[in-house]
Amino acid sequence: MISSFSNGFWSKDYATGVKKLFDCLDNGVEENEQVKNLLKLYKEANEEFGEKLQEITKECLKGKKPENTEDGATSNKAFEGLRSEIANQGKQHIRIAKDLETLIIAPFSKMSIDHSQKLQTSQQVLTNQIKSYEKKYYTLKKTKSAYYNKCRNLEDYEEESKESNETTSEAITDLTTVSSPQQQSLLENDDDLIQLGFMEFRPEELKEVLAQVLQEIPLQDYRVPILGTYPNTCSGNIIVSWLQENLPVPTLVAAEAFGQDLIAQGFLRHMGVGGSFVNSTNFHYQWKDKAFQFAGLNSVDSLVENAKALPLVGEYLSDYISHRKLYSSETQSQRLKREVLDANKIYSESVVDLDKCRTLVEETIADHLQFLQKCETDRVLYYKDFFMDLSTIISNFLPSMKLLADQIVVYQEIIQPESDIRYILESAATGPFLPRVEIYEDYYNDIKDQIFGVDVEFLSHRDKKRVPIIVSTILSYLDLLYPTLASDEVRQNIWLVNSPLSSVHQLREALNHSSSVTKEVLSQYTPSVVIGVLKLYFLELPDSIVPSSAFELIRSIYMNHSNDTPYRLRLLQNLLSQLRRVNLATLSAIITHLNRLITLTPNKETFTINLANSLSLCISRPATWNLGIQHDKHPTKFMEDLLTYGPSIFEELRKLNSSKRVSDRVLYQSSATPRSTDVSPTRPDSISSVRSHTAVESPRSSFEELQPSEIPAESEFTLENVPTSLIRSSYALNTRKTRRNFSHSSASNESAAIFIDQDAKIVNEAVASRDSSLSGS
């Protein structure tokens, strides 16, 4: 399932996966240093040994008298020959040392430095990008919380207004109108929580905190050229240090968010261009008079006097008063509604801003993961080359060391970059690419212009289609596109290649907030990008088409019945029958499309396997990822079975459902009163609870009116038309699970108990038994 860095080091927070990869790559940097030190020592040893050999050939001649030298003596000739060979061996070792320095050590050192710098640069870029994403993520949570609080305040006020009589309401309105703007502001905000960073304070609590800050941190005058000197200032790092020492602010991100909110609340002012808070000694901030007044303290100096000499500063300081005058005639109801609209606008902008940042982070990480895999591959290949160079150097100069040179060649052949990459993935991978989308969640459950990351059932209900429009439109577009492609190989490859994430995100952005998904928009992009955005849509769903709660059950089926194909397919058929109607219809659409493509192309078996590897996580994925799952092949096998036997499974489901539907009609007509069973979704309390909770119509409502003659023929069958009686037990289970929030383990055990039995009657009895136990608890 995980075959490369680009699909192996992802995590929900992005930082965990990236950190794990760099920890592994740092081992390679350390290995480079060890090899470099070994080569240096080996070079020095050869150099010292060669010099020593030459030295001893000279030492042996000391004390020997020239007249005692007999050129004709054989012993003297042997002595001179031995001395010459030893001296020559010394020269060879010195030449080896020089070649090691110039041909191996110097290039290897350069490669090692370049490799280390590449990793450091990549790590710094990714760290900064992820930190920026985290800041925007925390900003989104803060703006969402503020928006929800404003909505609740408005609801509370409206409820209180309904309960009070008109006379009391008029008296309260008159009282608030007579009171001064400052008193009115204090009364209105007295019960509101003030949010600073990731903390919330009541006004009296914030008063104590501000008083302590202003009394403990050193305040000084700060001179700005031309504008003059400003009192009551300090640098950003002083404020951050105080916050981390005195408040539960564990991280710099949280501290900077706290400081940013001090600016937003009007307690602090940045001495310079812009209004951002930065933890730095170079950024200075002035505590406004509002902070001293709120804390019940007197500022050392007032900026009012400076304002007389500096009209620009006076205008800046009067913004707050102008704002209060602008809305002084508002009633409390108008003010609350305005604040809700303002908070909603800020929250929705934060969602869009975070989504853009997230896609940029994912594109950057994907590019860097590919780059880092290439860096590691090049490093290992360099090892392979330098082993061969070392063997050549030794064998050329010292034939007697041929055995050592041959052994080095053996070591060189052992090095396989692909194996090293695979080892890193198998031992340290954190998970495949499974993006986490933060969608705009309106307080009143209204999602209008979002497609990606939205639950498939909600999206289908909004589109008034049984299959989301984005899925059906893309599949229809591909059907029209296939005949125009050059060959079967091209038609297969567009499903197997991974398009650049930046291109996929560009099409995603064009579709996500558009009023409709059109083929005209799709035609502006390559086929592989269109298929890439379809895969991305499935990956960004809150849960996979085959829910994560069934992941362990599917694993159990393939572990226990991998060789018994008929029984395994029957269990899968039972599993699919319990999916939600929209999930069934969507799964049917994609599998039917792919099965038709497989049928019309050659090399069906190979294409099916490759396609299953590419799409397995789009159809079924676990709730959480771990190392044990990454070696699990059952998602791919499950996808292979769907691609191979899907049409047969769906046809069998249609036949079983048709016969059961006829029997249900006979029983209904022969009985004066409808049957009452625990699994029937026709119970009034079940239907009402589902409608009130999901705001989606009951699955039965679209099918109960069908007459037998209206049941689609085999050639027309898709799971969009599966009658609801087949999935009644699954829908009842899904409703109860949603409302009562069952644990994962209990849901898995109950599902396993259902699929062990082969008879549909036993399945219904098992569900009914479980329902009775749940109602008792």
From Swiss-Prot:
Subunit-structure text: Interacts with pak1/shk1.
Cytoplasm listed as a keyword: yes
Localization of this protein: Cytoplasm
Domain DEP: 213-296
Site (Arginine finger): L496
Gene3D superfamilies: Arfaptin homology (AH) domain/BAR domain (1.20.1270.60), Rho GTPase activation protein (1.10.555.10), Winged helix-like DNA-binding domain superfamily/Winged helix DNA-binding domain (1.10.10.10)
Function: Acts in signal transduction. Negatively regulates the pak1/shk1 control pathway.
GO cellular component, as recorded: cell cortex of cell tip; cell division site; cytoplasm; division septum; growing cell tip; medial cortex
Biased composition (Polar residues): 668-692
Annotated protein name in UniProt: Rho-GTPase-activating protein 8
InterPro entries: AH/BAR_dom_sf, DEP_dom, F_BAR, FCH_dom, Rho_GTPase_activation_prot, RhoGAP_dom, WH-like_DNA-bd_sf, WH_DNA-bd_sf
Residue ranges of the region described as Disordered: 667-709
Keywords attached to this entry: Coiled coil, Cytoplasm, GTPase activation, Phosphoprotein
Pfam families noted in UniProt: DEP, FCH, RhoGAP
Start and end residues of each Rho-GAP domain: 454-650
Residues recorded as bearing Phosphothreonine in the entry: T682, T694
Top-rank taxon, per record: Eukaryota
Residue positions where Phosphoserine is found in the record: S676, S680, S686, S698
Protein's gene: rga8
Domain F-BAR as annotated: residue spans: 3-420
Annotated GO biological process: cytoskeleton organization; establishment or maintenance of actin cytoskeleton polarity; small GTPase-mediated signal transduction
Major localization class: cytoplasm
GO terms, molecular function: GTPase activator activity
Entry coiled-coil feature ranges: 117-172
PTM annotation: Phosphorylated by pak1/shk1.
